[in-house]
Design a protein with these regions (language model features):
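ATP-dependent helicase/translocase motor core
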Residues: 2-277
Length: 277
């Protein structure tokens, strides 16, 4: 295969997401990220807001969101909250919807964030303005474990503020692609998973992975149905593909046939987690 630089892979990936219905947007820095979030948040909640948020109301929302752990941010993301407006009225607001058609999907790249060091993030997927999926790419031939190491460096030095709302990381060198859940803990490469189709065929190529995993309806299902907030360990978890397909099969069995079903698999496969979902 011909040589492909990381920059070429990145642009090819963004073009693929554009074809899948994502809007492309330039977000050069963190301030621009916050500004875009405000615009998209108001647009997403337009049916509940009869007028734009005031500066004080927006500050109140940011105070609710910022300074929290990854786990706390994941809980906030999935909860509705009551905003008391300056005129005394109250309104219930939310950050995203389980119906993918009601959300705003954007993709940006090369956002520069200043922490202990100056870092430039590869590709960020935004849902209603919030950075929920972060993609780190390496050129073909580079072990994707290098991307995990890069994520860890970013988490240590600059993944703060709204970036605590990242739910899923995706790493790829174009040929091999994996995903894993964000965490307040050190990330382990063993918890990064390949995605597969229903017949358990791995979709390792970044384009094939994007078409399946990052389809707008599917990624919303992953975020709303197939992630677990482990309150005991304060841990965010994402399900493996066979667990997702097992849950979907169990739900179909229960809803369409009104009959019972069971999970059968090997030790350590995640039967308890699948049954829980």
């Amino acid at each position: 295969m011909a040589y492909q630089s990381e920059a070429e892979l990145e642009l090819q990936f963004i073009d693929q997401l554009y074809k899948q219905g994502y809007d492309t947007i330039s977000i050069p820095d963190y301030d621009a990220l916050v500004e875009n979030f405000k615009v998209q948040f108001e647009a997403f909640n337009a049916s509940k807001l009869d007028k734009p948020l005031t500066d004080k109301e927006w500050e109140r929302i940011l105070n609710l969101m910022l300074g929290k752990s990854v786990f706390q941010s994941a809980k906030i993301l999935r909860d509705k909250f009551v905003l008391e407006r300056e005129d005394g009225s109250k309104v219930y607001l939310s950050f995203f919807d389980s119906d993918h058609t009601k959300n705003i999907f954007q993709v940006t790249h090369q956002t520069t964030v200043v922490g202990k060091y100056v870092n430039r993030y590869d590709v960020t997927i935004l849902v209603n303005g919030l950075p929920l999926i972060q993609v780190e790419l390496k050129r073909r031939g580079i072990d994707i474990r290098e991307a995990v190491n890069q994520v860890m460096r970013y988490k240590k030095h600059s993944y703060n503020g709204l970036y605590h709302f990242i739910q899923i990381f995706i790493i790829s060198n174009g040929v091999d692609t994996k995903y894993f859940a964000n965490s307040d803990r050190e990330m382990l490469h063993s918890l990064a998973f390949f995605w597969t189709d229903f017949d358990n065929v791995r979709l390792t190529n970044l384009k094939d992975f994007s078409i399946a995993f990052l389809a707008r309806d599917h990624i919303i299902k992953m975020l709303t149905r197939y992630m677990i907030l482990n309150d005991t360990d304060k841990l965010l978890m994402v399900m493996r593909p066979y667990q997702v397909y097992a849950v979907e099969a169990l739900v179909r069995q229960a809803t369409l046939t009104n009959r019972n079903a069971y999970v059968w698999h090997t030790t350590g496969a995640g039967k308890t987690l699948t049954s829980f979902k």
